[in-house]
From Swiss-Prot:
Protein name (record): Chlorophyllide a oxygenase, chloroplastic
Classification of source organism: Eukaryota, Viridiplantae, Chlorophyta, core chlorophytes, Chlorophyceae
InterPro entries given in the database record: Cholesterol_7-desaturase, PaO, Rieske_2Fe-2S, Rieske_2Fe-2S_sf, Ring-hydroxy_dOase_2Fe2S_BS
The keyword Thylakoid belongs to this UniProt entry's keyword annotation: yes
Comp. bias regions, Polar residues: 92-106
Source organism per UniProt: Dunaliella salina
Residues that hold Fe cation according to the record: E275, D279, H282, H287
């Protein structure tokens, strides 16, 4: 064991050296982010200047304005440090809607769009159809009794906490009295107390206490159906009660140990980030200071689909899948820790790294990213002091390399460009994800088609 610890310490030391050598590249990326923000701000000024000239420019502004604001207001802690993993909790709430609660379906809806799912099209909008899914919002073990976790979902603020029975619950993060964020208060005996006037709310959203005044019954805030499963807290923001429980694909595979669970708020539209995660052809060009450092440029990169939304990469030993509505799973075959086995399938390798990415649409132009990393070897390594800090640092460097690119794409889309003007064969999985999004936008995606290929899927061209 001592020799293993010494070996791991050497590898950690080597990893730290590599991270230090990437500082210049990260600084360049941050400078480019600043330039892209300035360019996006310039585009917004141009849009505002021309908004009164024609009706068409007004229409464009309504589609892009919110995304421009998101791009031009990147917080300093995001732009200067790449990513900051925020340790927050996770919870579980009632699956019924109380009578006093306004339903999520009462939110303002956009008008219908022409149905054309076969054509690829980029979008920065959050389609209404995306609401009718279960969403992982936080890692369950990070929600301790007495803790609150605020988050946004489809532009609505919510807060997670554990009720008097330690069951996770989710209510709107806005007091029914004066709209003060409830997450600024505290949890008392499983109820959230507003810090403004002391009103208290239970897990169903009902107000249970109004100090210093006569109690008004029937007052409350909205609540979402919420369950805890596979180490995540899931919520249902859709229309009416959920039809079933969350899916079964998020648990770590048998024989794997979880080594890292990281949450990051990213100032990028969740679909752009998902398409980036579903693309490996960019790795040797983008991730030159992290995991793909030293990778040779392949003569050809291919994705061999084994299912409609899953398959294997060639020549990389990586299997990957997209799982509606916003989850990417990947298994990477390793010859040794940190080294891939080119020319093999992941299943043919002896060691594996399993990744789960959740790209939750927090609001237009912003994503709540949940990342879980598991290994089927080195189970003892998760007990090494501060090793989680190393994993988070590495994950931050990788995301930083991607962030400058997807922020650039987002700025171009705001200016009217299309990210799918020239798709290539190695874009197959990302293309299929985008066609799925197009189906959701057009109202063509059926709940029963989630786990099987439909005739609509079968008719999709890949490029």
């Amino acid at each position: 064991m001592q020799s293993k610890l010494l070996g791991l310490q050497d590898e950690i030391s080597e990893a730290r050296d590599k991270l230090r050598t990437s500082e210049a590249r990260v600084a360049q990326n941050l400078k480019r982010v600043d330039e892209l923000k300035a360019e996006a701000a310039s585009l917004e000024r141009m849009r505002l200047a021309s908004s009164s000239s024609t009706d068409s420019t007004v229409s464009i502004a309504s589609r892009g304005g919110a995304a421009v604001a998101a791009t031009t207001s990147v917080p300093d802690h995001v732009e200067r440090e790449g990513i900051q993993s925020r340790v927050r909790g996770s919870g579980m709430a009632s699956t019924s809607y109380p009578s006093h609660v306004p339903q999520p379906s009462q939110a303002v809806r956009r008008g219908p769009k022409p149905k054309d799912s076969r054509r690829l099209r980029s979008s920065l909008e959050l389609e209404d159809g995306l609401r009718n899914f279960w969403y992982p919002t936080e890692f369950a073990k990070k929600l301790e009794p007495g803790m609150m976790v605020p988050f946004d979902l489809f532009g609505v603020p919510w807060v997670l906490f554990r009720d008097e029975h330690s069951a996770p619950t989710c209510i709107k993060d806005s007091c029914a009295h004066r709209a003060c964020p409830l997450s600024l208060g505290k949890v008392i005996n499983g109820h959230v107390q507003c810090p403004y006037h002391g009103w208290e709310f239970d897990g169903s959203g009902a107000c249970t206490k109004m100090p210093s005044t006569r109690m008004c019954h029937g007052v409350g805030v909205a609540a979402l159906p919420c369950v805890e499963k596979d180490g995540f807290v899931w919520v249902w923001p859709g229309d009416g009660p959920p039809p079933d429980l969350p899916p079964d694909f998020t648990a770590p595979p048998a024989g794997y140990d979880v080594h890292a669970e990281i949450m990051v708020d990213v100032p990028v539209e969740h679909g752009l980030l998902m398409e980036n995660l579903l693309d490996l052809a960019h790795a040797p060009f983008t991730h030159t200071t992290t995991f793909a450092r030293g990778w040779p440029i392949p003569e050809a990169v291919r994705f061999h689909a084994t299912k409609m939304l899953a398959g294997d990469w060639d020549p990389y030993p990586i299997s990957m899948s997209f799982n509606p509505p916003c989850i990417a799973l990947s298994t990477i075959g390793l010859s040794q820790p940190g080294k891939i086995m080119r020319g093999y399938k992941a299943e043919e390798c002896k060691r594996h790294l399993h990744q789960l990415h959740v790209c939750m649409p927090s609001k237009e132009g912003h994503t709540r990213l949940l990342y879980r990393m598991s290994l089927d070897f080195w189970g003892w390594a998760k007990h090494v002091p501060f090793v989680d800090v190393l994993w988070k640092k590495i994950a931050g460097q990788v995301l930083g390399e991607d962030l400058v690119l997807v922020l650039g794409q987002q700025a171009r889309m705001i200016g009217g460009d299309d990210t799918w003007c020239t798709p290539m064969p190695y874009d197959k999985l990302a293309v299929r994800y985008r066609r799925w999004r197009n189906m959701v936008a057009d109202g063509e995606y059926e709940e029963g088609s989630r786990n099987r290929c439909t005739s609509q899927y079968d008719s999709w061209p890949d490029v």
